[in-house]
From Swiss-Prot:
Residues at which Mg(2+) binds: D517, D521
InterPro entries assigned to the protein according to its UniProt record, in alphabetical order: ATPase_P-typ_cyto_dom_N, ATPase_P-typ_P_site, ATPase_P-typ_TM_dom_sf, ATPase_P-typ_transduc_dom_A_sf, HAD-like_sf, HAD_sf, P-type_ATPase_bsu_IA, P_typ_ATPase
Protein name per the record: Potassium-transporting ATPase ATP-binding subunit
Assembly notes: The system is composed of three essential subunits: KdpA, KdpB and KdpC.
EC numbers: 7.2.2.6
Principal location class: membrane
Membrane topology: Multi-pass membrane protein
Catalysed reactions, semicolon-separated: K(+)(out) + ATP + H2O = K(+)(in) + ADP + phosphate + H(+)
């Protein structure tokens, strides 16, 4: 399950955590800690004849209580050890290097060599191939391949360039080729790598609101049991005198009873559950800025998902040329290829390839043609080519319609029918026009990912609503939404529309999760309850989000929700088990403990425990051992299942509630039998 080194370190750390200062952080286990000290003191008082407490029995209770505290410390230390192991590999990437600070951005030779730790926000640095990027920053000039394996674990280099949504670079990563001019956006101690190390080490982990609320409940229960246990000494003393039988309960038994009844199981494992949840997220290559974000992921009931890359494969391909009447398919293909020759997008290249495959169109001499390429812009929403008094454009239907009309041409109704047909089938239509005459439509096919419909069905079973966000027209969006099985969609989405959609759902009481990578996504990311920024995205997007996906995979959002729900399920399941345990231990111990005073209670000794001493020892041994048994479950988490919340609650109540009631009866009886056979009691 874990490396031997982590086990060894956890054993050492669990002993160090016996410090009173550290024990104060966990009030429930502090009760056990104080009980262990008192039992140890009573043993020595009995040993020297100062007290009437049985020295051998008291020593056994004291040792078991100390082991209970150590087991709780061990659970937390194991979880922290896994984080430290991950942090150690990250620390290897964080080292002080010499940076070339530019005095003048236009003169790459005028540099000052400065330690990376001395860089300040706004400094401009020049980084060459095979050099480490000294600090987090934004690329303002150049384009290069960057090895980010130290951060993401992915060996394939990625492109980082100025402008667009791939301009953010991380300190500690290495340039594989070319050069970059970077504006520093973080100082030493506040970099992305520093935040990662702090999070995985748990140094900056704060208790979440749910965790605090649960701890308040556990402390309240502990105080109630403490009050009840404290009254037992005078009560049993009075009762034994009145009954003329039995004797008052000993202080050792009061301590042992209190520990058995207090919610020590969940109290011991609560911290490790939270740390392990954060660790599982880190293993998925996601950095959460707080535990609150992970909990929110578990409560999310609305997911906003980008169509491209999440629902569809993201690389639309040209599949057909659909000419209008009077135009041949080859004529349309020829014009479409010419308009796409300088288009470096996947869609543009697929148009060129389709024309070659269908009609063997190739080998053009653009110099002889005096060709001038027209790039795509967000304003015109078209691209094309001008050559020898010919003008070809391709683009969105409404953009081409406006272009044709503005130049005195006629946009054929037949083209509208073709566009509607393509959009209705879930494709993207691009209209081609030559010399102000519409030639036809290129059918770009968007392929829905395999298995995505089943995943959305699982989410629906859990009560999570999925909404597809796309820039496509409503007809295309509706067709893809129907094929993918999402609940709703937002077509022709703008940053303002996304922000308003999130606010609308939040006003209705929903928790919303979304992903984003661009500066234009920042307002919506800042508004969302769970906001996952892509590592390849801009600095603004990363700062707006409360999580960063190092793999920059939009589908990761679904996995993040699963991890969040698993964390909440694990905490809830083990809390249920712990409380059920306490009820079972109460009914197992109390009758045996007091039937000396009240013989009628003998009828309630259903397990036939040998004696009060045996009952207490058996219960307190079980109380300690169950912590060790449940450590793997607290670290791994309760198995996640896609089903409605009501069914999930019923299932967990059956397994962990009923199981928590039955397990102590069986285990305590077996331990009692073992102690009797060994002659210990």
């Amino acid at each position: 399950m874990m490396e031997k080194g982590i086990w060894k370190d956890a054993l050492i750390q669990s002993t160090k955590k016996l410090s009173p200062k550290l024990q104060l952080k966990n009030p429930v286990m502090l009760l056990v800690y104080v009980g262990a000290i008192l039992a140890t003191s009573l043993y020595f008082l009995g040993f020297f004849g100062i007290s009437d407490e049985k020295s051998g029995y008291t020593l056994a209770i004291a040792l078991i209580l100390w082991f209970t505290v150590l087991f709780a410390n061990f659970a937390e230390a194991i979880a922290e050890g896994r984080g430290r192991a991950q942090a150690d590999s990250l620390k290897m990437a964080r080292k002080d290097v010499l940076a070339r600070k530019l005095k003048n951005i236009d003169d790459k030779t005028d540099v000052i060599e400065i330690a990376s730790n001395d860089l300040k926000k706004g400094d401009i640095v020049y980084v060459l191939a095979n050099e480490q990027i000294p600090m987090d920053g934004e690329v303002i000039e150049g384009a290069a391949s960057v090895d980010e394996s130290a951060i993401t674990g992915e060996s394939a280099p990625v492109i980082r360039e100025s402008g667009g949504d791939r301009s953010a670079v991380t300190g500690g990563t290495t340039l594989v080729s070319d050069w970059l001019v970077v504006r520093v956006t973080a100082v030493s101690g506040e970099s992305f790598l520093d935040k990662m190390i702090a999070m995985v080490e748990g140094a900056s982990r704060k208790k979440t609101p749910n965790e605090i609320a649960l701890q308040i409940l556990l402390v309240t229960l502990s105080i109630i049991f403490l009050t009840v246990s404290a009254t037992l000494l005078p009560f049993t003393e009075f009762a034994s005198k009145q009954a003329g039988a039995g004797s008052a309960i000993s202080i050792t038994n009061v301590i042992a009873l209190l520990v058995c009844l207090a919610p020590t199981t969940i109290g011991a494992l609560l911290s490790s559950i939270g740390i392990a949840g954060m660790s599982r997220l880190n293993q998925a290559n996601v950095l959460a800025m707080s535990g609150r974000a992970i909990e929110a992921a578990g409560d999310v009931d609305v997911l906003l998902l980008d169509k491209t890359g999440t629902i569809t494969l993201g690389n639309r391909k040209a599949s057909e040329f659909l000419p209008v009447d009077g135009v041949t398919e080859q004529e349309l293909a020829d014009a479409a290829q010419l308009s796409s020759i300088a288009d470096e997008t996947a869609e543009g290249r697929s148009i060129v390839v389709l024309a070659k495959e269908r009609f063997d169109i190739r080998g053009r001499d653009f110099a002889e043609m005096h060709a001038e390429f027209v790039p795509f812009t967000a304003t015109t929403r078209m691209s094309g080519i001008d050559y020898q008094e010919n003008t070809i454009r391709k683009g969105a239907a409404d953009a081409v319609r406006a272009y044709v009309t503005a130049n005195g041409g006629t946009y054929p109704k037949e083209c509208d029918a073709i566009v509607s047909k393509v959009a209705g089938a879930g494709g993207t239509p691009l209209v081609v026009v030559r010399n102000n005459k519409v030639l036809g439509v290129i059918y770009l096919k968007d392929i829905v990912k395999n298995g995505v419909k089943e995943r959305f069905l699982d989410l629906r079973k859990m009560g999570i609503k999925t909404i597809m966000i796309t820039g496509d027209n409503p007809m295309t969006a509706a067709a893809i939404a129907a094929e993918a099985g999402v609940d709703d969609f937002l077509a022709e989405a703008t940053p303002e529309a996304k922000l308003e959609l999130i606010r609308e759902y939040q006003r209705e009481g929903h928790l919303v999760a979304m992903t984003g990578d661009g500066t234009n996504d920042a307002p919506a990311l800042a508004q969302a309850d769970v906001a996952v920024a892509m590592n390849t995205g801009t600095q603004a997007a990363k700062e707006a989000g409360n999580m960063v996906d190092l793999d920059s995979s939009p589908t990761k959002l679904i996995d993040i929700v699963r991890i969040g729900k698993q964390l909440l399920m694990t905490r809830g399941a083990l809390t249920t088990f712990s409380v059920a345990n306490d009820l079972a231990k109460y009914f197992a111990i109390i009758p045996v403990l007091f039937y000396g005073i009240f013989p009628q209670l003998e009828a309630l000794n259903l397990m036939g425990l040998t004696s009060p001493t045996s009952a207490i020892l058996s219960a307190i041994i079980y109380n300690a051992v169950i912590i060790i048994i449940l450590i793997p479950l607290s670290l791994k988490g309760v198995k996640y299942r896609e089903m409605p919340a009501g069914k999930l609650l019923s299932r967990n109540m059956l397994i962990y509630g009923l199981g928590g009631l039955i397990a102590p009866f069986i285990a305590i009886k077996l331990i009692d039998m073992l102690l009797t056979v060994l002659g210990i009691v």
